[in-house]
Amino acid sequence: MTVNINELVKEHGFCVVPTEEKPFSLDEARFNFLAYLEDYPKMGFSFVKVANELVELRRKQEVYRLFGQCFLGAFVIGEEEQVFLLCNQEGREVFQESRVYVNSSLHTFVSSYSLFLSSIFLLKAKFYEMKQDEVEEIAANLKDQVLSLEKPLEQELPFWEHMAYLIEDDGIVLRDDLFHILNKEQ
């Protein structure tokens, strides 16, 4: 995963805290939720794969551990293990916030993100014959499934609601564009 840390520091006023590298234990390897997160570069989703790659960010009393990013900003784990999105410029335009609640835990984020990816692959499976009501059903199912993971629902889930909206509104990138493919060939 490549995140422009300088951009995060400049935009949000964080400082990066150097972390001490620790050996990876067998239990950490067995229960490593980060390893389940698949990158989806078509929409800028990328993640660290092991806990010792987490980057600690501090600002006044706030402490976060950076573990991923997407086209809307950086995914971080807060002090109470909740997942937030620290919004970049595009994310701030969408959410009108600099920080957005995403999920109650990394475990729930992994499940939610996996459901999101499965929705993308459902769209890909029938892209040439899918009707709008089927697309809307995929978006509604994503919202319902993510909401069911967050029982009891403590906060709204604007990030996942926006992902469902993008599915409905044909805002999900399903393939590499021709320009990208041609540039790769040269």
Pin down the residues of each PLM region.
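A surface-exposed partner-binding patch
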Residues: 1-88, 153-186
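Generic preference for well-ordered secondary structure
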Residues: 51, 93, 97-100, 133, ...
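Compact, glycine/acidic-enriched structural inserts
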Residues: 85-127
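An amphipathic alpha-helical core segment
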Residues: 114, 118-158
